[in-house]
Amino acid sequence: MTKKRYTLLKKDGKARRGEFVTPHGTIQTPVFMNVGTLAAIKGAVSSMDLKEIGCQVELSNTYHLHLRPGDKIVKQMGGLHNFMNWDRPILTDSGGFQVFSLAGMRKIKEEGVYFNSHIDGRKIFMGPEESMQIQSNLGSTIAMAFDECIPNPSTREYVEKSVARTTRWLERCKKEMDRLNSLDDTVNKEQMLFGINQGGVYEDIRIEHAKTIREMDLDGYAIGGLAVGETHEEMYRVIDAVVPHLPEDKPIYLMGVGLPSNILEAVERGVDFFDCVLPARNGRHGHVFTKEGKINLMNAKFELDARPIDEGCQCPACKNYTRAYIRHLFKAKEMLAMRLCVLHNLYFYNKLMEDIRDAIDGGYFAEFKAKKLEEWNGRA
Protein backbone atom coordinates (compact mmCIF):
# COMPACT_ATOMS: atom_id res chain seq x y z
CA MET A 1 0.00 0.00 0.00
CA THR A 2 1.48 3.36 -0.98
CA LYS A 3 1.78 6.07 1.67
CA LYS A 4 -1.12 8.57 1.61
CA ARG A 5 0.29 11.71 0.05
CA TYR A 6 -2.60 13.43 -1.74
CA THR A 7 -5.34 15.27 0.15
CA LEU A 8 -8.39 16.59 -1.68
CA LEU A 9 -9.13 19.90 0.06
CA LYS A 10 -12.05 21.19 -2.02
CA LYS A 11 -14.09 20.36 -5.10
CA ASP A 12 -15.90 22.88 -7.27
CA GLY A 13 -17.82 20.80 -9.78
CA LYS A 14 -15.16 18.33 -10.92
CA ALA A 15 -12.30 20.82 -10.41
CA ARG A 16 -10.06 19.67 -7.56
CA ARG A 17 -8.04 21.70 -5.07
CA GLY A 18 -5.50 19.52 -3.31
CA GLU A 19 -2.14 19.08 -1.61
CA PHE A 20 0.47 16.50 -2.53
CA VAL A 21 3.09 15.82 0.14
CA THR A 22 6.57 14.89 -1.12
CA PRO A 23 10.02 14.50 0.49
CA HIS A 24 10.95 17.84 -1.13
CA GLY A 25 7.93 19.86 -0.02
CA THR A 26 4.15 19.98 -0.36
CA ILE A 27 2.73 20.76 -3.81
CA GLN A 28 -0.43 22.85 -3.97
CA THR A 29 -2.62 21.61 -6.82
CA PRO A 30 -3.63 22.27 -9.55
CA VAL A 31 -0.01 22.97 -10.49
CA PHE A 32 1.97 23.78 -13.63
CA MET A 33 5.45 22.23 -13.72
CA ASN A 34 8.14 24.41 -15.28
CA VAL A 35 10.09 22.40 -17.88
CA GLY A 36 13.88 22.41 -17.59
CA THR A 37 14.74 19.60 -20.01
CA LEU A 38 18.47 19.47 -19.21
CA ALA A 39 18.08 20.62 -15.57
CA ALA A 40 17.74 24.25 -16.68
CA ILE A 41 15.02 26.35 -18.29
CA LYS A 42 16.12 27.36 -21.79
CA GLY A 43 16.47 31.15 -21.80
CA ALA A 44 19.09 31.67 -19.05
CA VAL A 45 16.62 31.15 -16.19
CA SER A 46 18.21 29.89 -12.95
CA SER A 47 16.80 27.88 -10.05
CA MET A 48 16.80 31.11 -8.00
CA ASP A 49 14.68 32.75 -10.72
CA LEU A 50 12.22 29.85 -10.59
CA LYS A 51 11.60 30.44 -6.91
CA GLU A 52 11.07 34.15 -7.51
CA ILE A 53 8.40 33.50 -10.16
CA GLY A 54 6.45 31.00 -8.05
CA CYS A 55 7.54 27.65 -9.51
CA GLN A 56 6.55 24.74 -7.26
CA VAL A 57 7.81 21.83 -9.38
CA GLU A 58 10.61 21.61 -11.95
CA LEU A 59 10.48 18.95 -14.68
CA SER A 60 13.60 17.44 -16.23
CA ASN A 61 14.08 14.87 -18.95
CA THR A 62 15.47 11.38 -18.40
CA TYR A 63 16.50 10.75 -22.02
CA HIS A 64 18.41 14.02 -22.42
CA LEU A 65 20.15 13.84 -19.02
CA HIS A 66 21.11 10.21 -19.68
CA LEU A 67 22.90 11.35 -22.85
CA ARG A 68 24.50 14.42 -21.24
CA PRO A 69 26.00 14.85 -18.75
CA GLY A 70 25.05 11.24 -17.95
CA ASP A 71 22.86 10.11 -15.05
CA LYS A 72 25.82 8.49 -13.28
CA ILE A 73 27.59 11.86 -13.19
CA VAL A 74 24.45 13.47 -11.73
CA LYS A 75 24.34 10.73 -9.06
CA GLN A 76 28.00 11.36 -8.19
CA MET A 77 27.11 15.04 -7.79
CA GLY A 78 24.46 14.13 -5.21
CA GLY A 79 21.42 13.90 -7.51
CA LEU A 80 19.51 16.48 -9.53
CA HIS A 81 18.44 18.58 -6.55
CA ASN A 82 22.03 19.10 -5.47
CA PHE A 83 23.34 19.38 -9.04
CA MET A 84 21.00 22.23 -10.04
CA ASN A 85 20.60 23.76 -6.55
CA TRP A 86 16.84 23.21 -6.32
CA ASP A 87 15.26 22.09 -3.03
CA ARG A 88 11.66 21.80 -4.23
CA PRO A 89 10.04 18.82 -6.01
CA ILE A 90 11.39 17.59 -9.36
CA LEU A 91 9.52 15.30 -11.75
CA THR A 92 11.48 13.37 -14.37
CA ASP A 93 9.68 11.99 -17.39
CA SER A 94 10.64 8.46 -18.37
CA GLY A 95 12.37 9.23 -21.65
CA GLY A 96 9.71 7.31 -23.55
CA PHE A 97 8.31 10.30 -25.43
CA GLN A 98 11.77 11.36 -26.64
CA VAL A 99 12.71 7.81 -27.62
CA PHE A 100 9.60 7.64 -29.79
CA SER A 101 9.74 11.20 -31.15
CA LEU A 102 13.43 12.18 -31.43
CA ALA A 103 15.52 9.07 -31.69
CA GLY A 104 16.16 7.42 -35.04
CA MET A 105 16.04 3.75 -36.09
CA ARG A 106 13.71 2.57 -33.30
CA LYS A 107 12.98 -1.10 -32.71
CA ILE A 108 10.28 -1.83 -30.14
CA LYS A 109 10.61 -5.23 -28.46
CA GLU A 110 9.04 -6.74 -25.35
CA GLU A 111 12.22 -6.03 -23.38
CA GLY A 112 12.28 -2.34 -24.38
CA VAL A 113 13.36 -0.06 -27.22
CA TYR A 114 16.55 -0.07 -29.28
CA PHE A 115 17.33 3.29 -30.84
CA ASN A 116 20.06 5.62 -32.05
CA SER A 117 21.04 8.73 -30.10
CA HIS A 118 19.83 11.92 -31.78
CA ILE A 119 23.16 13.53 -30.78
CA ASP A 120 25.84 11.17 -32.11
CA GLY A 121 23.95 8.22 -33.60
CA ARG A 122 25.26 5.65 -31.12
CA LYS A 123 23.06 2.66 -30.39
CA ILE A 124 21.21 2.77 -27.06
CA PHE A 125 18.74 0.42 -25.34
CA MET A 126 16.11 1.61 -22.90
CA GLY A 127 13.49 -0.50 -21.20
CA PRO A 128 11.47 -0.17 -17.99
CA GLU A 129 14.37 -1.19 -15.74
CA GLU A 130 16.85 1.12 -17.47
CA SER A 131 14.44 4.08 -17.25
CA MET A 132 13.92 3.46 -13.53
CA GLN A 133 17.68 3.10 -12.95
CA ILE A 134 18.41 6.39 -14.74
CA GLN A 135 15.66 8.20 -12.82
CA SER A 136 16.90 6.69 -9.56
CA ASN A 137 20.40 7.98 -10.33
CA LEU A 138 18.89 11.42 -10.97
CA GLY A 139 17.10 11.19 -7.62
CA SER A 140 13.97 13.04 -8.74
CA THR A 141 10.98 13.37 -6.42
CA ILE A 142 8.60 11.75 -8.92
CA ALA A 143 9.61 9.28 -11.62
CA MET A 144 7.39 8.50 -14.59
CA ALA A 145 6.83 4.95 -15.82
CA PHE A 146 8.34 3.92 -19.16
CA ASP A 147 5.61 3.66 -21.79
CA GLU A 148 5.08 3.79 -25.53
CA CYS A 149 3.73 7.11 -26.71
CA ILE A 150 1.41 5.90 -29.46
CA PRO A 151 1.49 7.96 -32.67
CA ASN A 152 -1.72 9.58 -33.85
CA PRO A 153 -3.43 8.24 -35.87
CA SER A 154 -2.92 4.53 -35.07
CA THR A 155 -5.10 1.52 -35.82
CA ARG A 156 -7.19 0.03 -33.04
CA GLU A 157 -5.28 -3.24 -33.34
CA TYR A 158 -1.92 -1.50 -32.86
CA VAL A 159 -3.19 0.58 -29.92
CA GLU A 160 -4.50 -2.53 -28.12
CA LYS A 161 -1.15 -4.33 -28.49
CA SER A 162 0.80 -1.24 -27.43
CA VAL A 163 -1.34 -0.60 -24.33
CA ALA A 164 -0.98 -4.23 -23.21
CA ARG A 165 2.81 -3.91 -23.53
CA THR A 166 2.79 -0.57 -21.67
CA THR A 167 0.91 -2.30 -18.81
CA ARG A 168 3.52 -5.06 -18.64
CA TRP A 169 6.25 -2.40 -18.69
CA LEU A 170 4.52 -0.57 -15.81
CA GLU A 171 4.58 -3.74 -13.70
CA ARG A 172 8.31 -4.02 -14.36
CA CYS A 173 8.82 -0.32 -13.52
CA LYS A 174 7.08 -0.75 -10.16
CA LYS A 175 9.11 -3.82 -9.27
CA GLU A 176 12.40 -2.13 -10.23
CA MET A 177 11.49 1.10 -8.40
CA ASP A 178 10.78 -0.87 -5.21
CA ARG A 179 14.17 -2.60 -5.55
CA LEU A 180 16.08 0.62 -6.20
CA ASN A 181 14.44 2.45 -3.29
CA SER A 182 15.71 -0.28 -0.95
CA LEU A 183 19.39 0.07 -1.92
CA ASP A 184 21.84 1.75 0.45
CA ASP A 185 23.37 4.06 -2.16
CA THR A 186 20.08 5.30 -3.68
CA VAL A 187 19.92 9.10 -3.93
CA ASN A 188 16.23 9.36 -2.98
CA LYS A 189 14.84 6.30 -1.18
CA GLU A 190 11.35 7.84 -1.22
CA GLN A 191 11.21 8.31 -5.00
CA MET A 192 7.60 8.04 -6.18
CA LEU A 193 6.22 6.42 -9.33
CA PHE A 194 3.40 7.70 -11.54
CA GLY A 195 1.83 5.35 -14.08
CA ILE A 196 0.68 6.54 -17.51
CA ASN A 197 -2.68 5.87 -19.14
CA GLN A 198 -2.53 5.26 -22.89
CA GLY A 199 -5.00 4.25 -25.57
CA GLY A 200 -4.94 6.88 -28.28
CA VAL A 201 -8.37 8.37 -28.95
CA TYR A 202 -10.16 5.04 -28.30
CA GLU A 203 -12.19 5.79 -25.17
CA ASP A 204 -13.01 2.16 -24.31
CA ILE A 205 -9.32 1.16 -24.47
CA ARG A 206 -8.43 4.19 -22.34
CA ILE A 207 -11.05 3.26 -19.72
CA GLU A 208 -9.96 -0.39 -19.52
CA HIS A 209 -6.33 0.68 -19.17
CA ALA A 210 -7.24 3.19 -16.42
CA LYS A 211 -9.07 0.44 -14.51
CA THR A 212 -6.06 -1.88 -14.85
CA ILE A 213 -3.37 0.53 -13.70
CA ARG A 214 -5.59 1.88 -10.91
CA GLU A 215 -5.23 -1.51 -9.22
CA MET A 216 -1.43 -1.11 -9.00
CA ASP A 217 -1.77 1.46 -6.19
CA LEU A 218 0.79 3.92 -7.55
CA ASP A 219 1.61 7.37 -6.16
CA GLY A 220 -0.13 9.17 -9.03
CA TYR A 221 -1.53 8.68 -12.52
CA ALA A 222 -0.88 10.50 -15.79
CA ILE A 223 -2.90 10.73 -18.98
CA GLY A 224 -0.33 10.41 -21.76
CA GLY A 225 -0.37 10.27 -25.53
CA LEU A 226 -2.33 13.50 -25.99
CA ALA A 227 -1.26 16.79 -27.59
CA VAL A 228 0.20 14.67 -30.42
CA GLY A 229 -2.04 15.81 -33.26
CA GLU A 230 -5.57 15.10 -32.08
CA THR A 231 -8.12 17.93 -31.91
CA HIS A 232 -8.85 19.74 -28.65
CA GLU A 233 -12.33 18.18 -28.69
CA GLU A 234 -10.83 14.67 -28.93
CA MET A 235 -8.44 15.48 -26.08
CA TYR A 236 -11.25 16.72 -23.82
CA ARG A 237 -13.34 13.66 -24.69
CA VAL A 238 -10.49 11.36 -23.62
CA ILE A 239 -10.03 13.27 -20.34
CA ASP A 240 -13.78 13.05 -19.66
CA ALA A 241 -13.65 9.29 -20.26
CA VAL A 242 -10.52 8.53 -18.20
CA VAL A 243 -10.69 10.72 -15.07
CA PRO A 244 -13.72 8.98 -13.46
CA HIS A 245 -11.82 5.67 -13.59
CA LEU A 246 -8.68 6.91 -11.81
CA PRO A 247 -8.43 6.99 -7.99
CA GLU A 248 -9.82 10.15 -6.39
CA ASP A 249 -7.14 10.02 -3.66
CA LYS A 250 -4.22 10.28 -6.12
CA PRO A 251 -3.09 13.20 -8.31
CA ILE A 252 -3.93 13.17 -12.02
CA TYR A 253 -1.36 14.56 -14.47
CA LEU A 254 -2.12 15.60 -18.06
CA MET A 255 1.21 15.29 -19.88
CA GLY A 256 2.49 17.95 -22.27
CA VAL A 257 -0.60 20.21 -22.25
CA GLY A 258 -0.48 23.09 -23.07
CA LEU A 259 -2.24 26.37 -23.75
CA PRO A 260 -3.79 28.33 -20.84
CA SER A 261 -7.25 27.58 -22.28
CA ASN A 262 -6.42 23.84 -22.38
CA ILE A 263 -5.40 24.01 -18.72
CA LEU A 264 -8.70 25.62 -17.70
CA GLU A 265 -10.68 22.98 -19.61
CA ALA A 266 -8.67 20.14 -18.05
CA VAL A 267 -8.90 21.55 -14.50
CA GLU A 268 -12.68 21.69 -14.99
CA ARG A 269 -12.50 17.96 -15.77
CA GLY A 270 -10.52 17.04 -12.62
CA VAL A 271 -6.83 17.26 -13.66
CA ASP A 272 -4.21 18.32 -11.07
CA PHE A 273 -0.76 18.41 -12.74
CA PHE A 274 0.35 20.03 -16.01
CA ASP A 275 3.57 20.63 -17.93
CA CYS A 276 4.47 22.10 -21.29
CA VAL A 277 7.48 23.63 -23.04
CA LEU A 278 5.13 26.18 -24.63
CA PRO A 279 5.56 29.20 -22.29
CA ALA A 280 9.36 29.06 -22.39
CA ARG A 281 9.53 28.27 -26.11
CA ASN A 282 7.11 31.07 -26.97
CA GLY A 283 9.02 33.48 -24.75
CA ARG A 284 12.29 32.76 -26.53
CA HIS A 285 10.64 33.96 -29.76
CA GLY A 286 9.03 37.09 -28.30
CA HIS A 287 5.53 35.61 -27.99
CA VAL A 288 4.21 36.55 -24.55
CA PHE A 289 0.99 35.89 -22.67
CA THR A 290 -1.11 38.76 -21.31
CA LYS A 291 -4.54 39.12 -19.74
CA GLU A 292 -5.84 39.86 -23.28
CA GLY A 293 -4.15 36.79 -24.77
CA LYS A 294 -0.84 36.21 -26.54
CA ILE A 295 1.02 39.04 -28.31
CA ASN A 296 4.14 39.09 -30.50
CA LEU A 297 6.62 41.70 -29.26
CA MET A 298 8.44 41.59 -32.61
CA ASN A 299 5.55 43.47 -34.21
CA ALA A 300 6.37 47.05 -35.28
CA LYS A 301 3.43 48.45 -33.32
CA PHE A 302 5.35 47.86 -30.07
CA GLU A 303 8.37 49.95 -31.14
CA LEU A 304 7.24 52.95 -29.06
CA ASP A 305 5.07 51.09 -26.52
CA ALA A 306 6.00 52.31 -23.03
CA ARG A 307 3.76 49.80 -21.24
CA PRO A 308 5.05 46.64 -19.53
CA ILE A 309 4.32 43.32 -21.27
CA ASP A 310 1.18 42.90 -19.14
CA GLU A 311 -0.06 45.78 -17.00
CA GLY A 312 -0.45 44.76 -13.36
CA CYS A 313 1.88 41.76 -13.73
CA GLN A 314 4.44 41.43 -10.91
CA CYS A 315 7.09 39.45 -12.81
CA PRO A 316 10.66 40.86 -13.00
CA ALA A 317 10.21 41.86 -16.66
CA CYS A 318 6.95 43.74 -16.17
CA LYS A 319 8.11 45.50 -13.00
CA ASN A 320 11.21 46.89 -14.71
CA TYR A 321 10.98 47.09 -18.51
CA THR A 322 8.76 48.27 -21.37
CA ARG A 323 7.52 46.44 -24.44
CA ALA A 324 9.57 48.85 -26.58
CA TYR A 325 12.80 48.04 -24.73
CA ILE A 326 12.29 44.27 -24.88
CA ARG A 327 11.43 44.50 -28.59
CA HIS A 328 14.69 46.42 -29.10
CA LEU A 329 16.60 43.65 -27.30
CA PHE A 330 15.14 41.04 -29.66
CA LYS A 331 16.00 43.12 -32.72
CA ALA A 332 19.55 43.56 -31.36
CA LYS A 333 19.73 39.80 -30.67
CA GLU A 334 20.47 40.37 -27.00
CA MET A 335 20.07 37.27 -24.79
CA LEU A 336 18.32 39.39 -22.15
CA ALA A 337 15.27 39.57 -24.45
CA MET A 338 14.72 35.81 -24.25
CA ARG A 339 15.37 35.72 -20.52
CA LEU A 340 12.83 38.44 -19.74
CA CYS A 341 10.10 36.91 -21.91
CA VAL A 342 10.64 33.39 -20.56
CA LEU A 343 10.50 34.74 -17.00
CA HIS A 344 7.28 36.58 -17.82
CA ASN A 345 5.56 33.61 -19.46
CA LEU A 346 6.45 31.20 -16.66
CA TYR A 347 5.28 33.74 -14.09
CA PHE A 348 2.03 34.11 -16.08
CA TYR A 349 1.45 30.32 -15.96
CA ASN A 350 2.37 29.98 -12.28
CA LYS A 351 0.11 32.92 -11.36
CA LEU A 352 -2.71 31.45 -13.46
CA MET A 353 -2.47 28.24 -11.41
CA GLU A 354 -2.51 30.24 -8.16
CA ASP A 355 -5.64 32.07 -9.34
CA ILE A 356 -7.23 28.73 -10.35
CA ARG A 357 -6.56 27.35 -6.85
CA ASP A 358 -8.13 30.45 -5.29
CA ALA A 359 -11.17 30.13 -7.58
CA ILE A 360 -11.73 26.48 -6.60
CA ASP A 361 -11.23 27.36 -2.93
CA GLY A 362 -13.79 30.16 -3.28
CA GLY A 363 -16.29 28.07 -5.25
CA TYR A 364 -16.26 30.35 -8.31
CA PHE A 365 -14.14 28.34 -10.77
CA ALA A 366 -16.81 28.22 -13.50
CA GLU A 367 -17.13 32.03 -13.46
CA PHE A 368 -13.34 32.43 -13.37
CA LYS A 369 -12.91 30.12 -16.37
CA ALA A 370 -15.62 31.87 -18.41
CA LYS A 371 -14.11 35.30 -17.66
CA LYS A 372 -10.59 34.21 -18.66
CA LEU A 373 -11.72 32.59 -21.91
CA GLU A 374 -13.66 35.74 -22.78
CA GLU A 375 -10.64 37.97 -22.04
CA TRP A 376 -8.25 35.80 -24.07
CA ASN A 377 -10.77 35.50 -26.92
CA GLY A 378 -9.06 32.46 -28.47
CA ARG A 379 -5.57 33.98 -28.16
CA ALA A 380 -4.27 31.84 -25.27
Swiss-Prot record:
**Catalyses which reaction(s):** 7-aminomethyl-7-carbaguanine + guanosine(34) in tRNA = 7-aminomethyl-7-carbaguanosine(34) in tRNA + guanine
- Entry keyword annotation includes Coiled coil: no
Gene Ontology biological process terms in this record? queuosine biosynthetic process; tRNA wobble guanine modification; tRNA-guanine transglycosylation
Task: Cite the entry's keywords alphabetically.
Answer: Glycosyltransferase, Metal-binding, Queuosine biosynthesis, Transferase, tRNA processing, Zinc
Q: Which residues bind substrate?
A: 93-97, 147, 198, 225
What is annotated about its quaternary structure and interactions? Homodimer. Within each dimer, one monomer is responsible for RNA recognition and catalysis, while the other monomer binds to the replacement base PreQ1.
Concerning NCBIfam families, the annotation shows:
Q_tRNA_tgt (TIGR00430), tgt_general (TIGR00449)
Name of the protein in question: Queuine tRNA-ribosyltransferase
